[in-house]
Amino acid sequence: MARQKKYSGKGGARKKNKQKQNVAPRRRVEFKYKGFTLEELQEMPIKKFMEIVPSRQRRTMARGITPKQRKLVMKIKKARRLTNRGKEARVIRTHCRDFVITPEMIGLTFGIYNGKEFKEIKLVEETVGRFLGEMAPTRAVVQHGSPGMGATRGSMFVPIK
């Protein structure tokens, strides 16, 4: 019986690198939401858009809009008029976290209040049909440091640097 030759992992890696060099760069896939392109979504009436969003968002939209949300809609229309004229629209600051992102809002920058500050978020195609509040989390993961002098009762036994 002939012994099989053992290969080190180095030769395979070289082959893979050569293959990667010959591959053409990837094209960006055209965005579609539930089978509709962004242009189709922007031309679509709001009633038709309500039919294709998930039930939670559909229910929120069906209940109507509050006076605060109506004010936000007016700000969005004003910003959209400015961008159509070629001017740079300012950040739209809002406390309305329960507002559903519609196709007409894409490309605008929002300052969404998270309970402490306004997080600036530029809305892209992938955010259609979500709530504004999903883009600005209210809680952050706490990164505690090591205990120092006076930090805790147990830090008495931590040697002084």
Curated annotation (Swiss-Prot):
UniProt region (Disordered), positions on chain: 1-26
Annotated GO biological process: ribosomal small subunit assembly; translation
Any one cellular-component term (Gene Ontology): cytosolic small ribosomal subunit
Sequence ranges of Basic residues compositional bias: 1-19
Signal peptide: none
Similarity annotation: Belongs to the universal ribosomal protein uS19 family.
Biological source species: Methanococcus maripaludis (strain C5 / ATCC BAA-1333)
HAMAP family linked to this entry: Ribosomal_uS19 (MF_00531)
PANTHER family the UniProt entry points to: RIBOSOMAL PROTEIN S19P FAMILY MEMBER, SMALL RIBOSOMAL SUBUNIT PROTEIN US19
GO molecular function, one term: rRNA binding
Protein's name in the database: Small ribosomal subunit protein uS19
Keywords for this protein: Ribonucleoprotein, Ribosomal protein, RNA-binding, rRNA-binding
Described purpose of this protein according to its UniProt entry: Protein S19 forms a complex with S13 that binds strongly to the 16S ribosomal RNA.
Domain of life: Archaea
SUPFAM superfamilies, per the entry: Ribosomal protein S19 (SSF54570)
